[in-house]
Amino acid sequence: MLCLIFLLFSVSFSVQAEIYQWSDTKGNKHFSDRPYQDAQTLHISPGYTYHYVKKVYDGDTILLANGKKVRLLGINTPEVEGRNKTAQAGGEQAKRWLQKKLQNKKVRLLKDVEKNDKYGRLLAHVFTEDKQHINLELVEKGLASVNIHPPNLKYTDQLLKAELLAEQQRLGIWNYKEYQPKQANQIKQARFQGWQRVIGQIINIRHSRKYSYLNFSDTFGLKIERRSSDLFPELESYVGKKLEARGWINKHKNRYSMFIRHPSQLKVINSR
């Protein structure tokens, strides 16, 4: 038994471990991480490491007691006021909810393909000790929108189902005028900050070496990396259709664009 305990503590807690058990001719049980003849496989679930949350920066970023920042995967919450940042509608509500839920509490992190973002923050789905999925709860309550960054695709289906329900019930951000859909031809008339929803008809598609552009007009296009095109339906199938695009509006010279990383950012609007 002591050998089994030693083996369990020797195995990384983040990896599913296989331990083998067999009996010798005297009936004594033995355990190893290597398979022996006639050995039985024991499937040992990994243990979990929990971290204390020291600070909540906003609705989707926290600081652990070990000094590491964590950006919650698969979601986006509105900004709160800070250095070089203007407060956005719903940002403080998301932050307060997360503070109440997590500050000075213990959490478990579940990572995806990419471990860190370009700012050095850990990327993770965050779970409480009683197994509540915080990323998902933020979406369920309308405090966050879904924001998928391939190749990090864990829980995509669950997040999108929760978002659809929150939108249908007009919870949180889905009831703010700031996040109601704007017509594509209105974009040049005003400056819209933060995450937005834009509606328009795709008139054509243009390809460059690195990107494809689904164009609402000569001055506004949806920008998709060509290397990510296998995640989408045939891009040509969008031409002529009315879409709602979700993301951040960028301006370069006299042209506007929205970077589309995942097909969940595009909603086909059925014409009746």
Predicted regions and their residues:
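Small beta-barrel nucleic-acid-binding modules, primarily SNase/OB-fold domains
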Residues: 15-272
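Cleavable N-terminal signal peptides
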Residues: 3-5, 15
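N-terminal signal peptide c-region/cleavage motif recognized by signal peptidases
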Residues: 10-14
